[in-house]
């Protein structure tokens, strides 16, 4: 989920200038696991001692009930609980990369290994969330087709995530334990981020659309944030390739003690080495300079650190223990986004809140606290919980500074934008690209 850079911050960081010369094993897919521990049935007959009349009586067969086998493959659509596919919670690792230069020692350092071993719950939750993201998105990539409504697509992805986490999110507090880390974004063409359909939306995916699919999965508040772009016409291939390569370059550059401004420089250099021809016109691919990657904190999608996607003078260092969403956006337009269209994404702020006078706002805040906490949500999620006539209260929460609204972020109309994103864990011993898969 994209983090937007305030306009005044761009000036302070001196970003957006020309790029300079400053300069993987995939996880197991997890769609099948061996379960050969089922006992074989023992059937038999015992002959009783002869009765008084001399005839032997047979006892009834004592059949043992067959143990129900654990599922070994994901269903289509995905509905098999992830913990059923991995009953020992031995979820696939992400792509592990050794640190470079002065941090290379971390790979074999005993103290760092000990610290890594203390993170068992942290890693288990993250790897489960990542495997759920992989399985749901791979299903989505095979099944999303032009002609579907955006609501169908979003609900298909969200239903899959909820089923695999085992948290449908209907009972009070259930969505807070696991499920969607933030709403499924389906931003089309010039719209780069933060668009998901509200109730009643009839928008249909078309053959000529470029769609960013950005969704999060959380397990116990540990959020995997990963995104990809889909297009159905080959003329957009270079746009998608530029952004995918730029994201991979940013992921490769990231690491402990690396300055985020340098990561942005690497991303921009790769991104802007591409151009794309659309309908006979050639466009340079531009990094969208006021969108950022970001740290992820428990229960909070946007942490305190940002990762620019253009070179900047931001000297903030990445540190051991940080979780980063490295995401990049490329555009054939201005390379700058503005708020546009109807708001769908919201999140409660973590800091202290003002007193509320409106009863509807108080009631809605209680629902948000119990079901989402500081996790982002959308209007459709309130609809699922049976809330109605809540817009007045929701707008009051926004105007009071208690809830933040995230409007769609769009470049100029007629342009096309693309996005790819991975979540990385800066573990004490290695960098783990937790969301890496065979697809991207």
From Swiss-Prot:
Keyword S-adenosyl-L-methionine: no
Comp. bias intervals (Acidic residues): 36-46
Compositionally biased intervals (Basic residues): 56-70
Keywords assigned: Aminopeptidase, Cytoplasm, Hydrolase, Metal-binding, Protease
Molecular-function annotations in GO: initiator methionyl aminopeptidase activity; metal ion binding; metalloaminopeptidase activity
Cofactor entry: Co(2+); Zn(2+); Mn(2+); Fe(2+)
PROSITE patterns for the chain: MAP_2 (PS01202)
Main localisation: cytoplasm
One GO BP annotation of this record: proteolysis
Region (Disordered): 1-102
Pfam families: Peptidase_M24 (PF00557)
Annotated SUPFAM superfamilies: Creatinase/aminopeptidase, Winged helix' DNA-binding domain
Note on how the cofactor is bound: Binds 2 divalent metal cations per subunit. Has a high-affinity and a low affinity metal-binding site. The true nature of the physiological cofactor is under debate. The enzyme is active with cobalt, zinc, manganese or divalent iron ions. Most likely, methionine aminopeptidases function as mononuclear Fe(2+)-metalloproteases under physiological conditions, and the catalytically relevant metal-binding site has been assigned to the histidine-containing high-affinity site.
Positions annotated to bind substrate: 194, 302
GO cellular component assignments: cytoplasm
Entries under Gene3D superfamilies matching the protein: Creatinase/methionine aminopeptidase superfamily, Winged helix-like DNA-binding domain superfamily/Winged helix DNA-binding domain
Record localization: Cytoplasm
Binding of a divalent metal cation 2, residues: 225, 294, 327, 421
HAMAP family the record matches: MetAP_2_euk
Function: Cotranslationally removes the N-terminal methionine from nascent proteins. The N-terminal methionine is often cleaved when the second residue in the primary sequence is small and uncharged (Met-Ala-, Cys, Gly, Pro, Ser, Thr, or Val).
Family note: Belongs to the peptidase M24A family. Methionine aminopeptidase eukaryotic type 2 subfamily.
Protein name: Methionine aminopeptidase 2-2
Organism of derivation: Colletotrichum graminicola (strain M1.001 / M2 / FGSC 10212) (Maize anthracnose fungus)
């Amino acid at each position: 989920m994209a983090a937007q850079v305030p306009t005044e911050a761009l000036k302070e960081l001196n970003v957006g200038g020309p790029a300079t010369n400053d300069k993987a094993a995939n996880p197991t897919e997890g769609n099948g696991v061996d379960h050969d521990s089922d006992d074989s049935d023992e059937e038999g007959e015992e002959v009783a001692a002869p009765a008084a009349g001399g005839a032997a009586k047979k006892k009834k067969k004592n059949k043992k009930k067959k143990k129900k086998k654990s599922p070994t493959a994901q269903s289509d659509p995905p509905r098999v609980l992830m913990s059923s596919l991995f009953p020992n919670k031995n979820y696939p690792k992400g792509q592990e990369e050794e640190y470079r230069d002065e941090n290379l020692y971390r790979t074999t350092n005993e103290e760092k290994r000990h610290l890594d071993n203390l993170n068992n719950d942290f890693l288990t939750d993250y790897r489960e969330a990542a495997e759920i993201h992989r399985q749901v998105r791979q299903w989505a990539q095979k099944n999303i087709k032009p002609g579907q409504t955006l609501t169908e697509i979003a609900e298909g992805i969200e239903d899959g995530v909820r089923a695999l986490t085992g948290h449908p999110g209907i009972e009070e507090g259930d969505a807070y334990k696991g499920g969607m880390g933030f709403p499924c974004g389906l931003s089309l063409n010039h719209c780069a981020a933060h668009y998901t359909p509200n109730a009643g939306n009839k928008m249909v995916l078309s053959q000529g659309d470029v769609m960013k699919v950005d969704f999060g999965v959380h397990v116990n508040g540990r959020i995997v944030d990963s995104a990809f772009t889909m297009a159905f016409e080959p003329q957009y291939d270079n746009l998608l390739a530029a952004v995918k390569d730029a994201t991979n370059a940013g992921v490769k550059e990231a690491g402990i003690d690396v300055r985020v401004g340098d990561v942005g420089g690497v991303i921009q250099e790769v991104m802007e080495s591409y151009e794309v021809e659309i309908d006979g016109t050639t466009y340079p691919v531009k990094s969208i300079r006021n969108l950022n990657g970001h740290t992820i904190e428990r229960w909070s999608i946007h942490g305190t650190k940002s990762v620019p996607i253009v070179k900047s003078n931001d000297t903030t260092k990445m540190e051991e223990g940080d979780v980063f969403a490295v995401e990049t956006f490329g555009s054939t337009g201005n390379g700058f986004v503005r708020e546009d269209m109807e708001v769908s994404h919201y999140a409660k702020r973590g800091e202290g809140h003002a007193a509320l006078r409106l009863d509807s706002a108080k009631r809605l805040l209680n629902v948000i606290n119990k079901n989402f906490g500081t996790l982002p949500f959308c209007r459709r999620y309130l609809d699922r919980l049976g809330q109605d006539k809540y817009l007045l209260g929701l707008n009051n929460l926004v105007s009071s500074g208690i809830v933040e609204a995230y409007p769609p972020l769009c470049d100029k109309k007629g342009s096309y934008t693309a996005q790819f994103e991975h979540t990385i864990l800066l573990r004490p011993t290695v960098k783990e690209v937790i969301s890496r898969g065979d697809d991207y």
